[in-house]
């Protein structure tokens, strides 16, 4: 229903709209604008609880720029929307530092933004599952956690591409190779589950042996920005498809092409945070690989034989680990280690 309503607004300049990683607007015979909007989700609650705001802006840039580059567009401009319960100058400055750092990493310009003060809309407390959090033993049920200043953060990005260089997934075919580029932890998805699951058991400032760090250090790792290595790939070889592994995780591969089968049979060992989540949540692999990135933040699909060049660009030029994680076959769906996700 929503898709139909949106499609009904499309004029002659719209090339691709609802459903892909970015909306595409023709601006002349050769070039298109790619437009995308996204937020950081409930990761902002963790930042509020920890009173640590310096990396959340990186997440906001990453969630937008990574999606635009998936269609072969170079992100060039960004605007942000920051809503706060009260105008805390120090907090706002820290958030803006992260946005500026993310913009530099993505090589784009922040050209505008909006600051909204919304005390009646943003809560100053959040419902949490009961448990040990804060070092106190609690009973079953729910408790409230208070924060000094709730906020929300979102943004929109514009990218530009040549029409003949768009990457929309139509050229993906059986025999192609799938290369996965490593993530930097959870990135910005699954935080509602993680917050209720882990903060009921651990304090944010508690060091967890399985992680080798405090919980807040792990949960506030910024989303990795893949713009520069992907643009290097696009400029040097024929890339058939790119998937940013966010909400929906590996099921998102079908967004690229629903007429082939994506077989992920060589996935790396998941990082410790995902093992910790699985242990406490007691959910199976199908659910994990449908919810979390499991250590792979971006999938790049190309002809067999190009995998070494893709991995070299990531490792040698951008210090990112990358692996061959699977292949494309005839059929339909997404499979991880023989488990069908969709």
Question: What feature does the model see in each segment?
Answer:
Residues 39-52, 80, 210-214, 282:
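Glycine/charged-rich beta-loop-alpha catalytic/anionic-binding loops adjacent to active sites
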Residues 91-109, 115, 121-153, 201-220, ...:
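Glycine-/charge-enriched secondary-structure boundary and capping motifs
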Residues 27, 32, 40-44, 59-60, ...:
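Glycine-rich anion-binding loops of enzyme active sites
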């Amino acid at each position: 229903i929503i898709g139909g309503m949106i499609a009904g607004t499309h004029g002659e300049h719209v090339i691709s709209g609802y459903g892909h990683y970015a909306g595409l607007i023709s601006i002349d015979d050769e070039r298109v604008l790619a437009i995308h909007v996204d937020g950081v989700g409930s990761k902002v609650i963790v930042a509020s609880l920890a009173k640590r705001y310096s990396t959340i802006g990186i997440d906001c840039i990453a969630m937008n720029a990574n999606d635009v580059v998936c269609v072969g567009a170079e992100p060039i401009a960004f605007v942000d929307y920051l809503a706060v319960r009260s105008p805390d100058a120090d907090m706002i400055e820290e958030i803006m530092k992260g946005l500026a750092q993310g913009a530099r990493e993505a090589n784009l310009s922040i050209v505008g933004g909006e600051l909204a003060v919304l005390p009646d809309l943003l809560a100053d407390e959040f419902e949490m599952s009961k448990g040990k959090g804060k070092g106190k033993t609690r009973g079953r049920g729910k408790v409230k956690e208070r924060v000094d200043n709730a906020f929300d953060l979102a943004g929109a990005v514009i990218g530009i591409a040549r029409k003949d260089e768009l990457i929309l997934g139509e050229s993906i075919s059986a025999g192609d190779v799938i290369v996965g580029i490593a993530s930097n932890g959870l990135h910005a998805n699954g935080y509602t589950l993680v917050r209720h699951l882990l903060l009921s058991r651990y304090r944010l400032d508690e060091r967890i042996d399985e992680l080798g760090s405090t919980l807040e250090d792990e949960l506030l790792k910024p989303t990795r920005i893949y713009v520069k290595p992907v643009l290097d790939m696009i400029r040097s070889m024929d890339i058939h498809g790119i998937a940013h592994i966010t909400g929906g995780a590996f099921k998102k591969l079908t967004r690229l092409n629903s007429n082939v089968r994506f077989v992920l049979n060589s996935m790396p060992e998941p990082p410790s945070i995902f093992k910790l989540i699985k242990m406490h949540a007691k959910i199976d692999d199908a659910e994990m690989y449908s919810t979390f990135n499991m250590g792979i933040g971006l999938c790049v699909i190309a002809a067999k034989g190009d995998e070494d060049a893709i991995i070299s660009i990531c490792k040698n030029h951008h210090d990112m680990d990358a692996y061959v994680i699977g292949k494309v076959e005839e059929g339909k769906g997404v499979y991880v280690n023989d488990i069908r996700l969709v």
